[in-house]
């Protein structure tokens, strides 16, 4: 983990405001390391500048409160929602993810590219690209 920290990947203003303990279990910490090592750090190196994590790991309670799906990969430490500041720049980042052919399970252009959801899991990554 060169450019990201576990603390950064678990930070949540919502959890802090509501007093929710968003501490990940060991299995989620391991998955976060995999996500960073295989996707986020290589992407940051290629991008050449900071990438902000809006949301990484979410405990079940936090995931429910923010409207996450019941089977969200965020709950396992396999996903992060990222941005580089604007939809225009995020579209460039999305194009870079595709060009690098990073081992993503899902890469989702969220809400007009306001942020990008990226996930990685141990084993087979489906390389699914979607828009929501």
What are these regions (language model features)?
Residues 32-39, 49, 62, 78, ...:
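Amphipathic alpha-helical interface surfaces
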Residues 24-26, 52-57, 88-92:
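N-terminal start-of-chain detector that recognizes signal peptides
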Residues 1-44, 131-132:
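Extracytoplasmic cell-surface/polysaccharide-interacting catalytic and binding patches
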Residues 37-67:
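Extended, low-complexity, intrinsically disordered C-terminal regulatory tails
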Residues 12, 21-23, 60, 65, ...:
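Surface-exposed loop/turn and secondary-structure junction residues enriched for glycine/proline
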Residues 71, 75-76, 80, 84-132:
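Catalytic cores and adjacent binding grooves of peptidoglycan-active enzymes
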Residues 16-21, 46-50, 81-85:
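Generic detector of short, locally flexible boundary/turn motifs and exposed helical patches
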């Amino acid at each position: 983990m060169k450019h990201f920290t576990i603390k950064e990947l678990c930070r949540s203003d919502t959890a802090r405001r509501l007093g929710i303990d968003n501490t990940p279990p060991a299995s989620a910490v391991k998955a976060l390391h995999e996500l960073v090592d295989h996707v986020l750090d290589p992407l940051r190196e290629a991008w050449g500048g900071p990438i902000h994590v809006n949301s990484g790991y979410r405990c079940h309670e936090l995931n429910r409160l923010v409207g996450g799906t019941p089977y969200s990969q965020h709950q396992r430490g396999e996903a992060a929602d990222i941005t580089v500041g604007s939809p225009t720049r995020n579209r460039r980042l999305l194009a870079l993810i595709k060009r690098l052919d990073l081992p993503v399970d899902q890469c989702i252009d969220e809400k007009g590219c306001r942020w990008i959801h990226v996930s990685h899991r141990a084993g087979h990554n489906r390389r699914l690209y979607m828009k929501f």
